[in-house]
Structure formats: structure tokens, C-alpha cells
Amino acid sequence: MTFTRFVEAGRVALVSYGEHLNKLVVIVDILDQNRILVDSPSHGLKRKVINVKRIALTSIKVDDIARGAPVAEVKSKYTAAKVDETFAASGWGKKLAKREKRAALDDFGRFKVMVARMKKSKAINAELAKLKA
């Protein structure tokens, strides 16, 4: 298998560090080997220079974005490509959504999850006991 996730204009990435953690961005321009210019139309992140080490490249690419494309062009092509929906439907997006949902639980929510897991385990063990008998 060849590597297909290149740092290129139009590539969608996920910020993995800092104040914009877990936000999707589009690479607009490559400044040097360590820094890139990114823009995020859907998350309210204005055009910003970010270190390459602080992003994780996704397999999603917005087509026909030239280096240094204007903000309006990036926004229109981002929405046309349905990047947010595509990422949310991916395994990576589902995992992040699940993690955020669990982190937002209060004490009673965690208790309900624990009780549900106990009921599930009890039902599985009961069926297993029937099969063994």
C-alpha cells in the first residue's frame, strides 16, 4: 500500500494539539517544511499558521483548491464537498463523537452507563450458561 495522505493544498486535517483541538481544517498553503496555512470555514477558525506536528492528516481532500486560495473559495468548496458530514460518518469521526459524549456525562449519566453494562453482562452470562447446560 502506498502512502496517500500528503500535506497538500486542499487536504483536510484534524488539529491534534492546542486551543483548536479536534477541529477540522483545510490546508491552504505550505509555508515551509514545518508550518502550513490553514482555514476552517465550519469551526470559526480564521486563517492561521500552524505547525505540521500539531495536525493529523485525514483521507478527505477538497478538490480544486489552489495554493493561497481566497477564504470565500475555500468556504464554498468545503461546503460543496460536505467535509463535516463525511468526517462524521467515518470511524475516526464516530470515535471522537463518542469520546466527547462520554466526557460530557455527569455522575448520574456515568451511573446509568454502569447499570446498563451490568444488565448487558448479566444477560450474556445467562445465555452462556444456557448454552453450556
From Swiss-Prot:
One GO MF term: structural constituent of ribosome
Gene3D superfamilies, per the entry: 2.30.30.30, 6.10.250.2270
UniProtKB keywords: Ribonucleoprotein, Ribosomal protein
CDD domains listed in its UniProt record: eL14
InterPro entries to which the protein is assigned, alphabetical: Rib_uL2_dom2 (IPR014722), Ribosomal_eL14 (IPR039660), Ribosomal_eL14_dom (IPR002784), Translation_prot_SH3-like_sf (IPR008991)
Keyword Magnesium found: no
GO CC annotation, single: cytosolic large ribosomal subunit
Name of one Pfam family that matches: Ribosomal_L14e
GO biological process: ribosomal large subunit biogenesis; translation
Family in the record: Belongs to the eukaryotic ribosomal protein eL14 family.
Name assigned to this protein: Large ribosomal subunit protein eL14
Gene name of the record: RPL14
